[in-house]
C-alpha cells in the first residue's frame, strides 16, 4: 500500500516539516489531514527558509500534488496570504488543492477564541487564539461552514444567517461584544470563494484514484500525539486528532491503506502553552537548549518550554500511532551538553509507574525518574554517515530506541535537507 503517515511523537514542533520536505521528493501526493493555521512547519531548502501554517510541505516539488484534507480547518485569509507569498518567492502552487469538505475558520471563531481565553483568566489553556478550537466546536455542533459552501451563494447566506443568530447572542449577551454583520461576513465569504475557486476540489475521489494507481502518498500530520483530544494531556491539547488514525478520517481513506507510520521525535522535549510536562527544565540547562535551538513558536513566537527526552511519553506515542519507524531531529543541539538525561519512568504518589496517566492533574504530580548518559561535546552538524557519529551520540539514540520500542530510520543534525543521516 502506498500511504505513509508522518506524525509528531511529542507535543508538536518536532520537525515534521523538514521530514516531509525530505521525503516528498519521492512522493506523488502530500496531504495535510488535521489542525489549522495553529500549526507551523519550518522548511529550509535551496529556495530559502519558509514558515508554512496551512499549505502542505511538499509544495516545493513541482511534480507533487498537495492537498489540504477535510480534517483541516481553514482560515481563507491565511491560506491566500501564504499562497501569495510562495508565488512571490517563485514557488509553483498550481498543484495545491483544498477539500470542499474542509471547514472554515471565520471571524467570529477568532473573536470567540480570544474572549474565551480571557474569561478563563489564570486557568487559560494557552491556545493560539486563531479560532481553531471554536471552528472545530462548530463542526461537531453542526454549525460549521465548509469550503465548498463558498461556491454556493444562496446556501451560504442561508447558513450564515442561521449561525450568526446564535453567535451574536453569545457575543452580545455573554461577552458584551459587538455583533457580527451578516452582510459584511457574507461579502467577505463571496470574495474568498472567488479567490479559492481554482483550488477547491472533491479530494476524496482524487485520493481514491491515486491509491488505485499505486501512487505514493504522504499524510502530513500537524501538532503531536501528546496533544490529541483523546490520548493527550486533556484539556491542554488540540481540537483534532494528530494521530495516524486521525489521518484516515482527515483525508478520507480506510486504515488498511496506510502501509507505514513514521514518528518524528526531537532529541529533547518541547511544549508551547499550558499543561503538564514532567521533564520540564526550569533551570540554566533549559535556557541553554532554548537559546541554542532558537526554540520559539513558528505560529505564536512564544518561547517553548524545554525538557529532557520523555521515554514514557514516547513509548505511549509509538503505541497509539502504531509507529513502524521513527526519525530523531535536532540531535546536534545536544552537542553542547556534558551530560544528558532520559526519563525512563515516573514516580506518582510514591509509586514507580511506566505508563502515561490519562488525568492531567495526575501527570502534573509525576516526578521523572532519570537515567543519565554522558554527552559527546563535539559538533555533529557535518557528520553524514551514522557510523561517524560520536559513540556517546549513538548510545543515546540506541537507548531511546529501546525505551520507546521503535527504531530510528534517520537522524537530523541540522535544519537543511543535507543535514540528515540515514541508518
From Swiss-Prot:
Q: What is its EC number?
A: 6.3.4.4
What cofactors does this protein use? Answer: Mg(2+)
Its BP terms in the Gene Ontology are: 'de novo' AMP biosynthetic process; IMP metabolic process
The family annotation for this protein states: Belongs to the adenylosuccinate synthetase family.
- Which pathway does it serve? Purine metabolism; AMP biosynthesis via de novo pathway; AMP from IMP: step 1/2
Fetch the Pfam families from UniProt.
Adenylsucc_synt (PF00709)
Q: Where does Mg(2+) bind?
A: 13, 40
User: Which parts of the sequence bind IMP?
Assistant: 13-16, 38-41, 128, 142, 223, 238, 302
Protein name (record) = Adenylosuccinate synthetase
Main subcellular localisation = cytoplasm
What UniProt keywords are attached to this protein's entry? Cytoplasm, GTP-binding, Ligase, Magnesium, Metal-binding, Nucleotide-binding, Purine biosynthesis
Q: Which GO terms describe its cellular component?
A: cytoplasm
Q: Which HAMAP family match?
A: Adenylosucc_synth
Positions of the catalytic residues: 13 (proton acceptor), 41 (proton donor)
Q: What class of enzyme is it?
A: ligase
